[in-house]
Amino acid sequence: IKFRKYGVMKFIGHLDMMRYFQKAMRRAEIDIAYSEGFSPHQIMSFAAPLGVGITSDGEYLDIEVHSTRSSSESVKALNDTMVEGVEIVSYRMLPEHAKTAMSIVAAADYKVFYKDKGNCPFTLDELKGKVKAFYEDAPEILVTKKTKKSEKVMDLKQLVYDFQVEEADGCPFFYLKVSTGSVD
């Protein structure tokens, strides 16, 4: 299932989105499979949790079903149960032993805009110069990652596949393609 998350729903966290989709599956009468055992739960997994405050046009959710309607009927049934801010874009059956969305998604595209688009502090050329000085000219961008047990120095530049400055409505914004997986 591919879905969009926008508007006020950007403030809903990942665990609440999971509970929301569990209820939406029941309301839409999707014949979803349940795990076995003492406390059965719907078999579903999100490709990558989206941070609070971030909108998306392409989030992915895998579910296991016993039977299904056509893709268009399933999209309509789910969208009829959705609140404003969540929209099902597509629904399709995968082969029996297909990899999960979580294991396939390796990168994510981000567009980072200034909060007040009408009051941009930099011109496009100024921002391009700052990005060149910070990102392109630097051989590495080191940060210290702290865990409960240790500290580890990481090079963030290895996790950024593309970093551009673009312009929309007269205001520059950042376009980034970054790794979604873990890097040791």
Model-assigned labels for residue ranges:
Residues 2-45:
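N-terminal, positively charged regions that mediate nucleic acid binding
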Residues 28, 40-42, 57-61, 84, ...:
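A generic structural signal for short beta-strands and their flanking turns/coil linkers
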Residues 11, 15, 55-57, 68, ...:
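Generic alpha-helical scaffold signal
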Residues 19, 23, 48, 59-61, ...:
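N-terminal, well-ordered alpha-helical segments
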Residues 1-5, 61-63, 106-116:
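Short glycine-/aliphatic-rich beta-strand segments at the starts of folded cytosolic domains
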Residues 33-65:
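Short, charge-patterned binding micro-sites
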Residues 62-65, 69, 173:
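Amphipathic, charged alpha-helical scaffolds that flank and support histidine-based chemistry
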Residues 71-184:
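Internal, well-folded beta-alpha domain core
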